[in-house]
Curated annotation (Swiss-Prot):
InterPro entries: Bacteriocin_signal_seq (IPR010133), Competence_ComC (IPR004288). Belongs to the ComC family. This is Competence-stimulating peptide. GO terms for biological process: establishment of competence for transformation. The keyword Secreted applies. It is found in: Secreted. Acts as a pheromone, induces cells to develop competence for genetic transformation. Residues 1-24 form a propeptide. GO terms for cellular component: extracellular region. Keywords: Competence, Pheromone, Secreted.
Length: 41
């Protein structure tokens, strides 16, 4: 029983992390664009 509980918690954590990584992927190009546009000015 304990093993399955740990597995469920691990699954939840990895899913949340994957969503964060996906969100980060969308934000990263914007962040770099913003950073470089500020440097060129």
């Amino acid at each position: 029983m304990k093993n399955t509980e740990k597995l469920e918690q691990f699954k939840e954590v990895t899913e949340a992390e994957l969503q964060e990584i996906r969100g980060g992927d969308k934000r990263l190009p914007y962040f770099f664009k913003h950073l470089f546009s500020n440097r060129t000015k």
